[in-house]
């Protein structure tokens, strides 16, 4: 089977953003949908994940991942549906996950795709609670934080795709969980739906005092997603032998120059463990997490929330929104609907 006279829309990097990215930093281009060669698979993108790490890929310098080049399709995790397959492992109509980027259609090698058989969760969940964000939470909590019953566990960006799972896992371990989120509505959801013991609004006039009130016995575990003032408030209240999982620093992703770091002298005296991690260093965690989490989602005991925008053209504004904390839950772009 071949595809003819059909167009693919892609969003490519037009220029490197200075500060918060905008639609002007990207360009929508069209070309003819290519036909897959033997061993390749043509997919139609249904869902696109928008994640904070994308901002780092827009910088010229390389970090833990290769920078996106000018004119290159923007990166991103996707859920797609197979249109044409030259790989016997996939059939037309199959649902697949992959990092196929900001485009309506893509050609992939079979090894770049993972087949998804949705059960008790919608397809979109495989980009959030059952995907990379969920696996990130699982790895950081189980490998670094290792919460124990009765300990105080704090997570920043608590209403986000990662933070919401982090807190629920810590609660399952018996910890007292305090979230930090932006706004009363997010804190209400964190406590009322996710079951956190308390939540602090990071916009509070005296964040350090509010956090101290929520954590009267100090902080034993901290899952870091934000940095900045939140980190400063938490670090001053860490207990001896506290563990800190450094997952992200979203407050400074748009900065042209990173601000100076905190004075870490207390780490020695309090014997604090601070460890950065990247979930893609642990590919086995994705399989473990999905097997563990799918039944929890199906039975409703692992809660999540999605913030959905329709249309690929909204991806640049969505990226700016997540970096500014304007999303509420896992941010997704619905690129197309499933074929019947």
Where are these regions (language model features)?
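C-terminal capping/lid region of NAD(P)-dependent oxidoreductase domains
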Residues: 2-8, 301-308, 316-340
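A short N-terminal beta-strand-loop micro-motif at the entrance of redox/enzyme domains
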Residues: 2-3, 15-46
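Glycine-rich beta-strand-centered segment in the early N-terminal region that forms part
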Residues: 33-50, 58-102
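Short, well-ordered loop/turn sites that connect or cap secondary structure elements
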Residues: 89-90, 147, 238
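Short helix-loop-beta connector
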Residues: 120-123, 146-152, 216-219
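Mid-domain Rossmann-like dinucleotide-binding core that forms the NAD(H)/NADP(H) cofactor-binding site
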Residues: 127-205
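Glycine-rich phosphate-binding loop and adjacent beta-alpha segment
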Residues: 191, 229-302, 335-340
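Short amphipathic alpha-helix with an adjacent loop that forms part of the alpha/beta core around
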Residues: 206-217
């Amino acid at each position: 089977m071949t595809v003819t006279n059909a167009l693919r829309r892609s969003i490519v990097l037009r220029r490197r953003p200075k500060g918060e990215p905008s639609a002007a930093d990207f360009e929508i281009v069209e070309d003819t949908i290519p036909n897959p060669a033997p061993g390749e698979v043509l997919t139609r993108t249904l869902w696109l994940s928008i994640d904070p790490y994308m901002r780092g890929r827009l910088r010229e310098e390389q970090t833990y991942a290769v920078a996106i080049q000018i004119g290159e399709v923007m990166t991103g995790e996707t859920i797609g549906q197979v249109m044409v397959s030259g790989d016997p492992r996939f059939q037309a109509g199959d649902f697949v996950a992959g990092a196929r980027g900001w485009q309506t259609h893509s050609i992939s090698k079979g090894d770049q795709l993972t087949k998804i058989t949705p059960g008790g969760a919608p397809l979109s969940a495989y980009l959030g609670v059952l995907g990379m964000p969920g696996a990130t939470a699982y790895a950081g909590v189980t490998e670094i934080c290792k919460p124990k019953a009765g300990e105080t566990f704090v997570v920043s960006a608590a209403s986000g795709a990662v933070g919401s799972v982090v807190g629920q896992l810590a609660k399952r371990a018996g910890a007292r969980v305090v979230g930090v989120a932006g706004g009363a509505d997010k804190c209400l959801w964190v406590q009322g739906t996710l079951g956190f013991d308390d939540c602090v609004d990071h916009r509070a006039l005296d964040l350090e005092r509010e956090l101290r009130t929520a954590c009267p016995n100090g902080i034993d575990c901290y899952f870091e997603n934000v940095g900045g003032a939140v980190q400063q408030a938490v670090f001053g209240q860490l207990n001896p032998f506290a563990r800190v999982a450094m997952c992200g620093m979203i407050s400074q992703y748009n900065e042209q120059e990173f601000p100076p770091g905190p004075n870490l002298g207390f780490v020695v005296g309090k014997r604090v463990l601070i460890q950065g991690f990247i979930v893609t260093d642990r590919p086995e965690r994705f399989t473990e997490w999905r097997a563990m989490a799918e039944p929890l989602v199906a039975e409703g005991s692992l809660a999540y929330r999605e913030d959905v925008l329709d249309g690929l053209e909204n991806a640049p504004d969505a990226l700016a929104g997540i970096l500014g904390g304007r999303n509420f839950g896992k941010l997704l772009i619905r690129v197309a609907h499933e074929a019947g």
